[in-house]
Amino acid sequence: MSSGIILLIVAIVLLVIIAYLVGVIIRKRNDSLITSLEERKQALFALPVNDEIEEVKSLHLIGQSQTSFREWNQKWVDLTVNSFADIENHIFEAENLNDTFNFIRAKHEINSVESQLNLVEEDIASIREALNILKEQEEKNSARVTHALDLYEKLQASISENEDNFGSTMPEIDKQMKNIETEFSQFVALNSSGDPVEASEVLDRAEEHTIALGQITEQIPAIVAKLEDDFPDQLDDLETGYRRLLEENYHFPEKNIEARFQEIRESIRANSSELVTLDLDRAREENTHIQERIDSLYEVFEREIAAYKVAAKNSKMLPRYLAHVKRNNEQLKDEIARLSRKYILSETESLTVKAFEKDIKEIEDSTLAVAEQFGLQEKPFSELQVTFERSIKTLTNVESGQMDVFAAVKDIEKIESQARHNLDVYVTQLHMIKRYMEKRHLPGIPQDFLSAFFTTSSQLEALMDELSRGRINIEAVSRLSEVATVAIANLEDLTYQVVQNATLTEQLLQYSNRYRSFEAGVQSSFEHALRLFEVENDYQASFDEISYALETVEPGVTDRFVNSYEKTREHIRF
């Protein structure tokens, strides 16, 4: 055999071996792919879709939800019955083709199975997602329905437990509860018939009505308690108190109290009847008006009770106080009469005492008997309180006025005595001033001093004349005494001033001799001042003239003389 043939055979054998090896490799690779596809199929088949379907089925879906569930359930059945069986057949076919080294057809089958698995995966994901949505939606709807039903049941239980607290509103509350129950039944019917939108609206209304009725029932007991318990109790208390007060001889300015009791009871009954409409705002407002009317009756009774305490106290005090003030007035009249015999008094005191007597007489006539027979009166104590307080106030004013009049007349005799004493003193002082001036040996007395002296003397004479009358005008005495006091004080000051001016002028005239010979101004002022001093007796002008001239030549000289004089000045010895 030639070497060429051998080489050909070897080449063919090698090709066969290589082809076999390639086939084995491709077969193993396909086996691996087929195994992977089988595992994917098993994994998909093992998903808990059936459990999820059963879980959703147990929710007892209705309406559109139930229709949707059936569609997805049928899709799952189709997958398990048809798609998985078809995939299984293709896998089996791919295995046979791969085992017979029909790799091209095997590859085609593998690709087909892979595509089918991809579609199945998507379908299963859609099914599971839809089931989950149905489950969540149903749970949400169920929770909403459960919440609404819980509200209703709690409201029903609350109403049942507190039925006695709702009074006349109970029939209307029962009616509202039945309406809500009807709405729940309507919701179930609509939901079952596949109309979830309208069913949801009905459920919303049922829940809103439940909440609203719950809020109303929370407020009703307080209103009913007022109408059925508080107001009747207060009225009973008022009527009992009213009868007791009448037995204790109380009287009232209001004559319609019994009618007001009846009107309030009618208002309570009317409000209870109107409450069945559940118009709570109106009921509360009417309750407020009823309470205000009850409170006004309490105020009437409390006012009279408080007035009794004050009036009873004042009824005991008034007669004693009246007697005291009347006694004071008699004493004051006697004192004024006694003083009038010696003094001319102001008419004001007499008129005032007469006015006091009139006020006292009016209280004696109008109020004294009422106070003394206080327990037998048939007037409201509040009116008696006002009457007594007005009378006591009048007596207080009278007593205060009496004290003022007494203060005005009690010092009349002292005023006279003091005026006589002052007159004696002032007359003595006038004589001492005259002697004091005479001892000065002045060239003459200034006219202003003479005028003041004789005026003061006249005023003392006027006071003396007034004190010498048979009936003394005490007001005139007081006035003249004050005038005399001022006049004598002014005269004393003027006396000191005249003497000081005269003395200082003499001293300065003598001192000016130092300058007269060589100071023409001093000489001229000396001559002028001397004429004023000796001829005109104007000591103030003379002092001003000479002191001015000396100050021009010797500043401070005047002050030196003035200071020296003030230290040695002789005082009038009274």
Swiss-Prot record:
UniProtKB keywords: Cell cycle, Cell division, Cell membrane, Coiled coil, Membrane, Septation, Transmembrane, Transmembrane helix
GO cellular component: plasma membrane; septin ring
Coiled coil: 102-141, 274-350, 459-520
Main location: membrane
InterPro entries attached to this UniProt entry: EzrA
Residue intervals on the Cytoplasmic side: 27-574
Regions crossing the membrane: 8-26
Annotated localization: Cell membrane
GO biological process, alphabetically ordered: division septum assembly; septin ring assembly
Membrane protein topology class: Single-pass membrane protein
Pfam families, per the entry: EzrA
Extracellular topology ranges: 1-7
HAMAP family: EzrA
Protein family (similarity comment): Belongs to the EzrA family.
Function: Negative regulator of FtsZ ring formation; modulates the frequency and position of FtsZ ring formation. Inhibits FtsZ ring formation at polar sites. Interacts either with FtsZ or with one of its binding partners to promote depolymerization.
Name the record gives this protein: Septation ring formation regulator EzrA
Organism listed in the record: Streptococcus pyogenes serotype M49 (strain NZ131)
Organism placement in taxonomy: Bacteria, Bacillati, Bacillota, Bacilli, Lactobacillales
